[in-house]
Amino acid sequence: SMDDFHAHVSYCMHESVPVKGHLLRLHEPRWFGPLLCAVGDRQRQAILGAGSHWFWHDSHTWREATPDLHDPAPGYRPLPRLSLDRLETTTPYRLAAEARGYRDHYEAVLPQNETPTAWILARLQEAHGAGFRQSCYLERWLRLAIRQGAGFHRRPPYSMFLEDESKTPGYRLSAMEGAMENEHATV
């Protein structure tokens, strides 16, 4: 039954966590690590102080964080209020984390004369700057860059699709992928 299945999955999840406690489900766990990097020490400790161990999956690997045990003011602290500007500062950290994760998957097919993580990060920054901000779009852009080379988006026909702001980012990216497929199609 669904109740038995739910109980079994809950048991497996809680038993796989090395420390007994509760799980907090974030809407977008990939942002948790970058958020911890972007906030100041006090805000980071206030966030981490709400639990004894934090575990999250960033789409590539499991991550872990613990609060500072030498914190001079332990005890209850309200969670910090984060402004939109502060959340925007997480973007470079998120892109760097994605680049590090993609390196393991794509390193064998990347240019040999550059550092893999730096090359991937530069491509992800290009994609983000062009309006492709979702993780699925970032990886699709990266695959295009691997196949077509860095700066592919500045050359026709890709530049034509990229400049068409009347279309959604997903549509423009699909059109660029289609152009690549047309290049390699047999007649």
Named regions from a protein language model:
Residues 2-187:
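A contiguous, surface-oriented mixed alpha/beta subdomain in the mid-to-C-terminal portion of proteins
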